[in-house]
Amino acid sequence: MESPLTPSAQPAPMPSLVAATGPSTPEIPPEVSQIARFAKLDDLLALGRANSLWPLTFGLACCAIEMMAAGMARFDISRFGAEVFRPSPRQADVMIVAGTVNKKMAPAVKLLYDQMLEPKWVIAMGQCAISGGPFKYPGQYAVVEGVDQLFPVDVYVPGCPPRPEALIEGILKLEEKITGKRRFPVAQLKE
């Protein structure tokens, strides 16, 4: 009985996926690169994390109203990967601190940050969260002058209060920080 694979129909031997320089630099055969895409696992994880941010809202003052407006239909923050505001720190990976943090509330804010799972990021929204805002004056005793004194902040969104568009820009900056590239490039202005 003749083999179903004649000598001309037998597949060519698969070329080695290991380059001559060593196992750390694989060489992809051209016939494979035409039908498949390759990426580093870290890059794929970063892309997934950046496009599915789960924000924990911590609205403390007037900035919280603008943060809520960003989640409504007019601005629709879910188009940018921050789908649903989470009520629990164990379900969130981005903490948006919007408003004034006083020293009595600081331990609770720090505890919420500590309860978030890794990887976790923080967006400081508004001048009060960034630097104490109008409550920062000589001799004040009650206001934390910036949440970066409690934990690291990844993105600062300035304004008093910042508009929902500014928060969306902050989320895009955070995505850029996670993946290393911008999803919606900003047009460069000619001088």
UniProtKB/Swiss-Prot annotation:
Q: Where in the cell is it found?
A: Cell inner membrane
> What cofactors are annotated for this protein?
[4Fe-4S] cluster
Q: GO molecular function terms here?
A: 4 iron, 4 sulfur cluster binding; iron ion binding; NADH dehydrogenase (ubiquinone) activity; NADH:ubiquinone reductase (non-electrogenic) activity; quinone binding
The cofactor binding remark recorded in the entry reads: Binds 1 [4Fe-4S] cluster.
Keyword Ion transport among record annotations: no
Q: Name the catalysed reactions.
A: a quinone + NADH + 5 H(+)(in) = a quinol + NAD(+) + 4 H(+)(out)
Task: Return any one Pfam family short name.
Answer: Oxidored_q6
Q: Where is this region: Disordered?
A: 1-25
Q: What transmembrane ranges does the database entry give? A: none
Major place of residence: membrane
Q: How does it assemble?
A: NDH-1 is composed of 14 different subunits. Subunits NuoB, C, D, E, F, and G constitute the peripheral sector of the complex.
Homology family: Belongs to the complex I 20 kDa subunit family.
Query: What is this protein's record name?
Result: NADH-quinone oxidoreductase subunit B 2
